[in-house]
Amino acid sequence: MDDRRTILMDRYEIGRQLGQGNFAKVYYARNLTSGQAVAIKMIDKEKVTRVGLMVQIKREISIMRLVKHPNILQLFEVMASKSKIYFVLEYAKGGELFKKISKGKFSEDVARRYFHQLISGIDYCHSRGVYHRDLKPENLLLDENESLKVSDFGLSALSESKRHDGLLHTTCGTPAYVAPEVLSRRGYDGAKADIWSCGVILFVLVSGYLPFHDTNLIEMYRKIAKAEYKCPRSFSAELKDLLYKILDPDPSTRISIPKIKRSAWYRKSSDVNALKSKHETGDKVYKGEATTSDTTECSIFEGNRASSRDKVYTNGEATTSDSPECSNSDGKQASLSLPNLNAFDIISLSTGFDLSNLFEERYGRREERFTTRQPAAAIFAKLNELARRFKLKIKKKENGVLRLVAPKEGIKGLLELDAEVFELAPSFHLVEFKKSNGDTIEYQKLMKEDIRPALKDIVWAWQGGQHQQPEQSMQGMQGEQQPSRLPSQQPQG
């Protein structure tokens, strides 16, 4: 029997893997001093730096240190070695709320209790100027007492991220839960967008399926834009009324959290014991400042400057640790490959999926997109290879964007194009090329004669125009976007 233990920083014993994403793995762990169970998210510095996501990691740390609430998953500490960043998180023994829903819908009493906790946590976030922007059942965890914990703040925004118009402008989130104003690519109020997502979650809790769904993604987005959905007959009148006010396509008239708390359905008493009960339809259509310190950031994120003795950060204070890496008790370094940030912007990307024409006049675009089944690392490797081949200079930008610059000036100066990778599913990505400077004809020629042929071995389908393969593209996306997803519509019979 193998008695070796994996010990991290002389502080935590690492156990089984709990989850995995593109850039991180999450492990169950135990504090060696207190015996407390925790979850440790292990992130590879080099990988996230290479794809321009370090700013997102920093933001997630800042936000999680800013929000302390019983219904928010707690970040206990951040540690670092030369090559890795470790988030020590509260362990949610009950797992994802999504897994519970996938076994069957909840009664309104059970759903109400979870919804109370969700609204409480989100209301607190908003009071601190934090907007989650990726609320969905997969990001809602349960502890051993069935208490809800909002997690995964990788796409969250702080109020200071707003532009001069007071609105956020980054398209984030998971399509089925995203508010219409976010899909429109216009500025939006982060609080109002979160409220919409809470409404979709509430519908899912009580029905067991998504309110806005269609085998055709464009049609699904049209339904979201018009807030067109159907409630089962089993829904109470009070619940239907609340959903109608939350799923209001106009954010200016959408119900606020204080009014949600005063609604008849919300104020009904929830039987705590209802959570122990079993999960249990013509339809009506409704339209309806505690951030990471400078010292911490320097040491954690600038791995090349780290000393041979790693620093452990607890509540912003740095202490030293003699254990530079995660190692086994026999002295050998544990092999922990790390590719989870919780998705990039995954909507309104290709011509076929773009909803902007539902909201505004469409103008000529200078963008080309393709889908691929290759992992992110392979995509970026291919883009770097392509740049070397055609002597394009690479300028890295934030959030997984590479700027490619032509070696010589053209008719309208240097031709520049941005290549951005979006994750649609763990093994399904969309890559967008967008001209940011230079002559359009030169850009189109470069794409047609050089870039497209060079990418043919990783392209699954080009999106939009004559290159698109509509049925294959749409069906492939639909099939892989939400694996083991909730039922898409009300069961028959």
From Swiss-Prot:
It comes from the Eukaryota. Residues 152-181 are annotated as: Activation loop. One of its GO terms (molecular function) is ATP binding. Residues 365-394 are annotated as: PPI. Pfam families: NAF, Pkinase. It catalyses: L-seryl-[protein] + ATP = O-phospho-L-seryl-[protein] + ADP + H(+); L-threonyl-[protein] + ATP = O-phospho-L-threonyl-[protein] + ADP + H(+). Keywords: ATP-binding, Kinase, Manganese, Nucleotide-binding, Serine/threonine-protein kinase, Transferase. Residues 320-360 form the NAF domain. Its cofactor is Mn(2+). Residues 316-332 have a biased composition (Polar residues). Signal peptide: none annotated. GO terms for biological process: signal transduction. Belongs to the protein kinase superfamily. CAMK Ser/Thr protein kinase family. SNF1 subfamily. CIPK serine-threonine protein kinases interact with CBL proteins. Binding of a CBL protein to the regulatory NAF domain of CIPK protein lead to the activation of the kinase in a calcium-dependent manner. This is CBL-interacting protein kinase 26.
